[in-house]
């Protein structure tokens, strides 16, 4: 009987602990959301309340160290904020975030050298984290170190493009063009932004500008790639004959044909289908199938069924 009583007590404790863990699992994300909200509006009192509450729930300090540091930074206790970050970086699962925040706090202090070092450490931890590139670029731009500024903006923009953050991609392309109005990479990213916004007329106008720059800078291969992209834009504008013409010109370049030949055939087939020239549509479909027999028809049907902005 005594043994049964002990078993009941143990089971009750286990259930209690399980329920407590379950409740914590539900409430902790809510507290973190509240903490992030009060961080945004810079309500330090509420921030410290939620930080202390999370600590009491045994949330590991490295997971809330950044919020703790930001709260102290809002109070202008910068050294204490930086020390909190330093103490927790080695045990954090995302040290790049802490290094990045450290850079921000150093920058507020006016310690540009350590800010740069912190942002670079953030990049070393995770080269695919875009924000520190932006902060570095801003510093270099302010110091008139144009090449470094452009290179860091471009590093961030490429990451934004890969992750489909098109608005950021467009905004920081404009930042580069304020430094160098003929930077071809930035112009192409701006064009890509306009294309994704379905602002086809602007994207096409930028395409003509790219064409002129490619000629002036003797970047002929890039000029042919631009023809291909302009062909895509013209297709989405419903200008099928013009699209076919540019796709044909683009395919005359070996590099473009090798890289984009399959897509060129698909767009050309779809354009001819739109023009009701089924013989030529079938011909380019057959060429596309030589590259990917399983995907070609689906690719072309997707093009045919796509809702175009026609802006």
Language-model segment annotations:
Residues 40, 74, 108, 142-143, ...:
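Register position in tetratricopeptide repeats
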Residues 61, 95, 129, 163, ...:
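Residue-level recognition of tetratricopeptide repeat
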Residues 64, 98, 132, 165-166, ...:
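TPR alpha-solenoid repeat register
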């Amino acid at each position: 009987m005594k043994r049964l009583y002990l078993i009941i007590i143990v089971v009750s404790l286990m259930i209690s602990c399980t329920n407590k863990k379950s409740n914590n699992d539900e409430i902790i994300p809510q507290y973190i959301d509240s903490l992030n909200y009060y961080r945004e509006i810079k309500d330090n009192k509420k921030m410290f309340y939620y930080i202390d509450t999370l600590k009491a729930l045994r949330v590991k300090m490295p997971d809330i160290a950044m919020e703790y540091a930001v709260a102290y930074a809002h109070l202008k206790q910068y050294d204490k904020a930086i020390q909190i970050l330093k103490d927790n970086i080695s045990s954090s699962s995302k040290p790049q975030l802490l290094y990045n925040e450290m850079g921000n706090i150093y920058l507020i202090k006016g310690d540009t050298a350590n800010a740069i070092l912190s942002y670079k450490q953030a990049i070393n931890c995770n080269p695919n984290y875009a924000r520190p590139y932006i902060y570095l670029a801003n510093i270099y731009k302010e110091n008139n170190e144009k090449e470094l500024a452009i290179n860091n903006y471009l590093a961030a923009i490429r990451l934004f493009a890969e992750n489909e953050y098109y608005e950021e991609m467009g905004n920081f392309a404009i930042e580069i063009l304020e430094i160098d109005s003929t930077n071809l990479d930035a112009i192409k990213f701006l064009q890509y932004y306009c294309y994704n916004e379905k602002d086809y007329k602007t994207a096409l106008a930028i395409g003509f500008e790219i064409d002129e720059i490619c000629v002036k800078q003797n970047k002929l291969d890039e000029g042919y790639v631009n023809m291909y992209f302009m062909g895509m834009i013209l297709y989405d504008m419903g200008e099928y004959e013009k699209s076919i013409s540019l796709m044909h010109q683009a395919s005359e370049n070996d590099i473009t044909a090798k890289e984009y030949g399959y897509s060129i055939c698909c767009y050309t087939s779809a354009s001819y289908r739109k023009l009701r020239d089924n013989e030529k549509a079938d011909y380019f479909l057959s060429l596309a199938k030589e590259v990917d027999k399983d995907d070609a028809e689906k690719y072309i049907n997707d093009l045919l069924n796509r809702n175009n902005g026609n802006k």
